Amino acid sequence: MNKLRKVLDIIEHKHLDAIIVLSDYNRRYLSDFTGTSGALIITPKKQYLITDFRYIDQATEQAQDFEIINRKSSLISEIKSILERENLSNIGFEGHLISYDTYVELNKGLITLISISNEIDKIREIKNKEEIQLIQKAAKIVDQTYEYILTQVSIGMTEREIKAKLESKMLELGADGPSFDTIVASGYRGALPHGVASDKRIEK
């Protein structure tokens, strides 16, 4: 069962007319669109990806199951315009991921917002064959990068220099980029739970 089919099952089970997806990672997961601005509207009959002019070509190439909307106004205004035009009123949304201000703005008008917190996250918990292969590829890149950096670190290097070498090697091996800030913390900084690389030098 593909990702969109599972979202349509949520729509049916929750008696919704549509689901709005605003979070970056759920938008990317469901549409394959990697741009940093946009929203999805998923209905039983049609799927929309709303973005701005900078990403139209990219969205068209990546999100082939979606109708691409080049927004002319704010993202929320464009969403509401489509919902009104398509006569969609019972709307699922990521209640645990959007701000209060966004909720208030969406809630103006003749729609009913219904939180589907964690429902899309549950879909993402079960990996398909392609996703498993990508995880295995990522793990291999991390292993190879770690072995490489052990041969590169020397006394006097800064944490930032090590970070740069790590990330450069990961890209060389085929990574798109780090999932989060690369953690490099030495000496007394090693106790930090999320030690973002600094100008501290490696000591003996």
Predicted regions: what is each one?
Residues 1-82, 140-141, 200:
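N-terminal accessory/capping or targeting/presequence segment of soluble
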Residues 4, 45, 77-178, 189:
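Flexible, acidic/His-enriched mid-domain "rim/lid" segments that flank
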Residues 22-28, 54, 118-121, 178-179, ...:
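Residue-level signal for pocket-adjacent positions within structured domains
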Residues 29-30, 58-59, 101, 192-195:
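Short helix/loop capping segments that flank catalytic or ligand/cofactor-binding pockets
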Residues 42, 84-85, 178, 191-204:
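Acidic/histidine-enriched ion/cofactor-binding microenvironments in catalytic or ligand-binding pockets
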Residues 61, 104-105, 125, 194-197:
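Short acidic, glycine/serine/threonine-rich loops at helix termini
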Residues 69, 132, 197:
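Short pre-catalytic strand/loop immediately N-terminal to key active-site residues, enriched for Gly-Thr
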Residues 184:
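Basic, ligand-binding patches in group-transfer machinery
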